[in-house]
Every structure is written in structure tokens, then in C-alpha cells.
Amino acid sequence: MDGPSPNHGDRRGQRPRLIVLHYTGMADAASARARLSDPLAEVSAHWLIHENGFADMLVAEDRRAWHAGDGSWQGQPDVNSRSIGIEIANPGDRPFAARQMDTLENLLGRIMSRWQIGPEGVIAHSDMAPGRKVDPGPRFDWERLARQGLAIWPSDRRGPALPLHECLTRIGYPDVDPAKRLAAFRLRFRPWAHGPESDEDRRIAASLLPV
């Protein structure tokens, strides 16, 4: 089934291996839907979750939506070709509504099952584009998703601190300016942390590495 947005193309021989979460950064879902469906805007996403929790399919999942932009993950550019994009209606300055998170959990579970994507494949827009993007932002509840097996979160049983650069590379972060990389990592896992890189950053990053 095709969605209403014309902004999509072929997946260039790839299949979805990632799910990228965004906030719309716009006043409401109606405004976001209009932009994501405007051929002149040249942006789109596969799904838009409205304020009331309605999941709106804008682009079929087997098509390449234009949501990620410049960036990379796990050393590979062209994230659009190998990802599914989910936009959540939120201006970026407030918590996400419970009904939106309920819908997101349900939607993620179905997409992950459909495309055989593990929790490590659910990432933030800010993860793959450090310094360029900040969504879904510091108010997004990643820990809630992790409790349902829908994302990764630091283990309570943390081992020794390991070099942060090495850990972030192994997790998937792009090799960009270290300060931007640290900011992107903290935005997701320590959103209210400030200051220079610390042992706590290193311990958390080490706990996220695949066993």
C-alpha cells in the first residue's frame, strides 16, 4: 500500500536494517504532514505519529523515504536506503505524549519483526548526524523503549571504563569532531550531562557494546 507522500525512491539494492526516530520540530502533526507530503520540500518519512497517537503511513516501508539526510551509521553513508524513518509530532520543546509513546512501542515492535531489526538498530536522528541534528531530543524516553526490547540502554552492571572513541565507533557513531560526537552520545544516554568527557561517559559507552 502506498502512502500519500510522493517523496520517495528505490532503495538502491538495500533493505531496512535501521529505524531512525525523529521529532517533527513543527507546530503540529497537520503542518508536518503537509511538509512531508510536499514534492517541493523533498523530505518525507515512512510514518508520522500524531499528537493523539494515530500512526499515519506516508511512504511504504519497502521504498526509500527522504528523512535522514547527510550522516552515517556503522561506517555506512546513505542511511535513507537502509532505514525506516518515524516522525513523532513534537515541536522539540516538550515531553512526548503517553499515547504517542504507546503507539510508537506498538509500531516499532511490528516493524522490527517485519524486517528483522534488533534493538541496536533503533537509533536517533542525532546519533547518525552529530552536530547537525538533535532530534528526538533530550526529553525522549529511550529507557522506556529499552525496557520493551525496542532500543538499547546502558546496563546497570557497568564494567571498566574503555576509551570513548573506540566504544562510540563500535556502537556505530560517525567519526566526526569528538565534541560533536560526545554531545550526540550524551543527548541520547546522558541528556543533562555537561562538561568534558568523563569516566561515566566511558563506562556507559562500554556497557552498550555488543557482548
Where are the language model's segments positioned?
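Active-site-adjacent loop/helix surface patches within enzyme catalytic domains
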Residues: 1-120
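Basic/polar, cationic surfaces and motifs that engage anionic cell-wall
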Residues: 77, 92, 96-211
